[in-house]
Amino acid sequence: MHYKQYLVVIPGIVLAFVLYTLSQGFNNILGIELLGYEKSPISTAMIAILFGMFFGNVFKMRENFIKGLEFTQKYILKLGIICLGIQLKPFEFLEFGAIAIPLIIICIVSVLIVIKLLVKKLKIPTRMAYLISIGSTVCGTTAIMATAPVIGAKKNEVSYAIANITVFGILSMLIYPYFANFYFDANPTFIGLFLGTSIHETSQVAAAGLIYDQQFNSPETMNVATITKLIRNTFLVIMIPLFAFLYNRGQSKGKNYSILAIFPYFVLGFVGMIILRNAGDQVFLSTYKEIWINTVQYIKASSKIFLTMAMAAIGLSTNLRDLKNMGYKPFVVGFIGMATVGVVSILTIELYINFLS
């Protein structure tokens, strides 16, 4: 009986993997071959969810795929988030931490306050507000995917939030490098801090840094932007349990409530991967360097595959009519969230510049 229960999820998992493969291939053609980037600035996860939504709404999904798609969204997603921790090396961030961490905290708090006020004004669903908030402040689609299961977000809410964050992330990726060069008078450190705190996705930050480097010959800017963004990504460890607590406390309405019941324990696996990476760098780089580097790269690649498969599964399970019914208001919140994090980042960096002078 148990053996058959495992077999029933295989078709859906395979379908999600096939869609990941198609999405990755399409992204390589679009971002590398056509646009000419060394690495595509477009999120493969976003392409996967769009492909999934297309196929899922054009063709009727067969019953034998459903359980596997649900398994992918629930468990393979969490496995991908756990593996994501292997790419974070906080001990290397100490040099920029004194500047970047306060800046990141101020940006996060400011956006959360603004979005909370907008939610009351525009009356959008609480889950949607949480998804847009964490996507705008921490690390884009990855943060949305990680937060969705702990607040019980619906598939259409996840799809909408990811589309929201991706659109505004790409806009800021294309505009901010040129704006920052003008505003910060070509200072590589301040421009890097601004790009790293104001653009949603890690891939978009890297692309913005690359655009700036190619346009203004400043590799230092790209390095500062990337490090700042990775520091920002580590806040996922704090924000997911916090959002789980706040959301579920709000839903309990006076009933008995336990943080242990809703704590996202996969976050512990994420933290464990961060510890493993830093411990491994200390122990194995001097003795088994090539093996350790290959292992880290393998886990990184696996994380991207698992997360993109989960997005493909979400897309396949999303009904476009549900997205249409959600209206334009969440996009207004997403735009204002993008503008807020940009303005707050500029003002905070200005204060820092004035302090130094």
Each model region followed by its residue ranges:
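Juxtamembrane helix-boundary/capping and inter-helix hinge elements in multi-pass membrane proteins
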Residues: 1, 32, 59-61, 88-90, ...
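Entry/N-cap segments of selected transmembrane alpha helices
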Residues: 11, 15, 71-80, 84-116, ...
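Structural signature of hydrophobic alpha-helical transmembrane segments
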Residues: 37-51, 74, 96-109, 133-136, ...
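Juxtamembrane and boundary regions of transmembrane helices in multi-pass small-molecule transporters
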Residues: 1-4, 16, 117-124, 175-198, ...
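Structural signature of multi-pass alpha-helical membrane transport proteins
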Residues: 2-71, 84-91, 238-303, 310-322, ...
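Alpha-helical membrane segments and immediately flanking helix-loop junctions
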Residues: 124-172, 190-214, 302
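Transmembrane alpha-helices that form the ion-translocation and gating core
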Residues: 102-132, 172-188, 279-283, 305-313, ...
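Alpha-helical transmembrane segments of multipass membrane proteins
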Residues: 19, 23, 111, 115, ...
